[in-house]
Amino acid sequence: MPLHGRHQAENITLAIAAVEAFFGSERPVPEEVLDEGLGQLTSPGRLQLIGNDPVIYVDSAHNPHGARALVEAVTESFNFEELALVVGVMSEKDASGVLRALAPIAHHVTVTPVSSPRSLDSDLLSELAHDAIPGTPIDVADSLPEALDHARAWAGAAEGRAVLVVGSVLLAGEAIAFSRSEGWGIA
């Protein structure tokens, strides 16, 4: 299964159970159909690889629960020595809760606005990040491209580092589109 995290496995298990319940026990789903379908499965914006050199992932986790699941998935699935987070959050979301949940994997953070009038102000997000992730370097960027430049430079300065863009579904989409426009060739 090409997805990361226990929560994704649980979601797939529930989906298979729903299909089996719909068709009934007299029409089981053939194993080869499941294998083929799961082998082609993608979940855009969920630990999606969008760049290499350095490695850059994007995830649309935008609440504390999703951020905790993301931290668990990153910890279980990857062996990054250090991770730079690019974080943008919408004003109506629990930014402090998201940042606290991300703290265990945050070695460097660049906050950025989301391209939306509902975006949380970057300076406020920076203050929240300093409180939620004490002792971690926090940068403020005026845009996602600037934030990615900061994070990529930091991650490229040492082996074992990577970048993770997180905090908003809109930010995830923006990062995927930006990676395509830059010709990173993955997303």
PLM regions with names:
Residues 1-108:
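Nucleotide phosphate-binding/pyrophosphate-handling subdomain across enzymes
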Residues 19, 183-187:
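S-adenosylmethionine-dependent methyltransferases
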Residues 26, 78-82, 130-135, 183-184:
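Short helix-capping segments at alpha-helix termini
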Residues 55-57, 64, 99-162:
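C-terminal helical cap/extension that packs against the catalytic core
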Residues 165:
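Solvent-exposed interhelical
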Residues 168:
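Active-site-proximal loop/hinge segments that shape catalytic or ion-binding/gating pockets
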Residues 172:
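RNase H-like, metal-dependent nuclease domains and their acidic two-metal-ion catalytic environment used
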